[in-house]
From Swiss-Prot:
GO terms for molecular function: heme binding; iron ion binding; monooxygenase activity; oxidoreductase activity, acting on paired donors, with incorporation or reduction of molecular oxygen. Tryptophan 6-hydroxylase; part of the fragmented gene cluster that mediates the biosynthesis of fusarochromene, a tryptophan-derived metabolite closely related to a group of mycotoxins including fusarochromanone. Within the pathway, fscE hydroxalates the first intermediate D-tryptophan to yield 6-hydroxytryptophan. The first step of the pathway is the epimerization of L-tryptophan to D-tryptophan in the presence of the NRPS-like tryptophan epimerase fscC. D-tryptophan is subsequently hydroxylated by the tryptophan 6-hydroxylase fscE to yield 6-hydroxytryptophan. Its cofactor is heme. This is Tryptophan 6-hydroxylase fscE. Keywords: Heme, Iron, Membrane, Metal-binding, Monooxygenase, Oxidoreductase, Transmembrane, Transmembrane helix. The gene is fscE. It comes from Fusarium equiseti. Pathway: Secondary metabolite biosynthesis. The chain crosses the membrane at residues 11-31. It is a single-pass membrane protein.
Length: 510
């Protein structure tokens, strides 16, 4: 008994010292972040400057809602705000080309944010500017305007498959989620280009909803991965069944990574088995033939690239297609005007659409641009680090400071886009100088050296799909309003309200 009391007397002071050291450490860290950090001079909420838990609450607990809090910060503090202990956010259109520079100035990614999808081997997640330039250079020719023109038959092949599926709904009269159909269409296009064969998701009777959930899972999960990057490695040590109980989204992320590994490994094996030039040309075949060093051609490296290309080439394109269709169907005058332009250009209903001719149609282009504006592209802020000090609104941003901007704020700026929440294609049909002013704030694909690789592919898919469906079919919205398609959550990609039923329509052949 006496021995136990003596031990207790020893433990209590030790525990007290540990607690005291912890409290003093937290206090000193708080003082450093609030008053002695290089970012201490920048305005913003003290709690945001103090801890990353502030962002965690809004993006993880409140599920992709930090962008709304950042908007409130700008309303209160101005165009440059400190949104966490290490990062600044800017809401000033004139600063966009400075941050997302296309010049020779280097822009590294912020490593904390770059790995948010659980891989660090893709072009998207590459942190150093020079390393990114090497990886991007191998992909740029494959996604150039010229290369995508040559891909037009592949896009049309999948469009024919989508039309076949729409015809089946014409016959049955059943309601379909057109957004889901658009998602698997985009997935089949990008998979055909990446791997030489489409995934065949359009052939699934229900448009492969579980696959779509799997591909979308890393988007929301990214908020959690940023905060706890070590968690993915820890979860890999657990049985898959247990992980599924804790987080089904993590299981889906592991599934897609394993799936990409199998696809890449299969392509490499086929390439080794077929040394002739008859092997199908595709993105990964081209990467394997490229001058990239061997370290850039491993299965693990290309797996990460595949995950990014499939995800990026699927979700954002489908989102824009949903916006074009919904806003066109929601206004009979718009529907009539677009149909008239398409009929004038292609009077023969059996004539195949041509991408070259579609790109010259002003009204169709205006509809797509307005859908891109309201769809935002990527909604999450894209942080970059400059080697030099940056000047913004009379403030000097220290070198190597993570700085981000957001397409939402650019596209919703009422000084540039009057009535910004309205779908108004006419704004893109004004005078040349007026359109140039809009273009400067039009950033669905971002800008600079880190801009979206698949921009030309997305444009081509959207042109072909919209022209084809509105030439050949009549749609009726079914229990669908704007809230089912407009952005409500920032899961890196824009996501509608959580109980959205999608873009539900009935369809008939014209």
């Amino acid at each position: 008994m006496v021995s136990s009391l003596n031990n207790l007397g020893v433990l209590l002071p030790i525990e007290g010292v540990i607690i005291l050291v912890f409290v003093l450490s937290c206090f000193s860290l708080a003082i450093k972040r609030l008053y002695f950090s290089p970012l201490a001079k920048f305005p913003g909420p003290k709690l945001a400057a103090l801890t990353m838990w502030y962002e965690f609450y809004y993006d993880v607990v409140k599920r992709g809602n930090y962008f709304r809090q950042i908007a409130k910060m700008h309303d209160q503090y101005g165009p440059v705000v400190r949104i966490n202990p290490f990062e600044l956010h800017v809401n000033d259109p004139t600063f966009y080309p400075i941050l997302y520079s296309s010049s020779t100035k280097k822009r590294d990614k912020w490593s904390w944010a770059a790995g948010m999808f659980g891989n660090n081997t893709s072009v998207f997640s590459t942190v150093p500017h020079d390393h990114h330039r090497i990886r991007r250079a191998a992909l740029n020719p494959l996604f150039s305007r010229t290369a995508i023109k040559q891909l037009e038959p592949t896009i049309k092949c999948q469009m024919h498959e989508l039309s076949r599926r729409l015809d089946s709904f014409c016959e049955s009269g059943m309601v379909l989620d057109l957004g889901l159909a658009f998602t698997v269409f985009a997935a089949d296009v990008i998979s055909a280009y990446c791997f030489g064969e489409p995934f065949g998701l359009l052939q699934d009777p229900d448009f492969a909803p579980e696959w779509v959930e799997t591909v979308a899972a890393p988007s929301e999960l990214g908020h959690l991965i940023k905060q706890f990057p070590w968690a993915l490695g820890l979860f890999r040590l657990l049985p898959r069944s247990l992980i599924g109980v804790i987080s089904p989204a993590i299981v889906r992320l592991y599934t897609i990574q394993e799936w990409m590994s199998l696809n890449v490994q299969s392509l490499i094996s086929k390439r080794h088995d077929d040394h002739s030039s008859s092997a199908k040309s595709c993105v990964f075949e081209a990467l394997l033939r490229s001058k990239l060093p061997a370290s850039e051609k491993t299965v693990d490296r290309l797996k990460g690239e595949g995950q990014t290309l499939i995800g990026a080439g699927t979700l954002t394109t489908a989102n824009v297609l949903k916006h074009v269709v919904f806003h066109t169907l929601d206004n009979p005058d718009r529907l009539h005007a677009l149909a008239a332009e398409l009929e004038a250009e292609f009077p023969d209903p059996n004539e195949d659409v041509s991408l070259d001719r579609l790109e010259r149609l002003p009204l169709l282009t205006a509809y797509i641009k307005e859908a891109l504006r309201l769809g935002y592209g990527v909604t999450h802020r894209l942080q970059l680090l400059a080697d030099e000090p940056l000047h913004c609104n009379g403030m000097i941003i220290p070198p190597r400071t993570p700085v981000g901007m957001t397409s939402i704020f650019m596209h919703d700026d009422p000084t540039v886009f009057p009535n910004p929440r309205e779908f108004d294609p006419d704004r893109w049909l004004g005078e040349v100088e007026d359109r140039r002013h809009l273009e400067r704030c039009f950033v669905p694909f971002s800008k600079g050296t880190r801009m979206c690789l698949g921009m030309h592919l997305a444009w081509a898919e959207i042109y072909i799909v919209i022209a084809t469906v509105f030439r050949s079919y009549s749609f009726q919205l079914h229990d669908t309003d704007r809230s089912h398609i407009e952005m409500a959550h920032d899961f890196f990609d824009p996501a509608p309200k959580l109980d959205s039923k999608g873009l539900r329509v009935t369809v008939q052949r014209k």
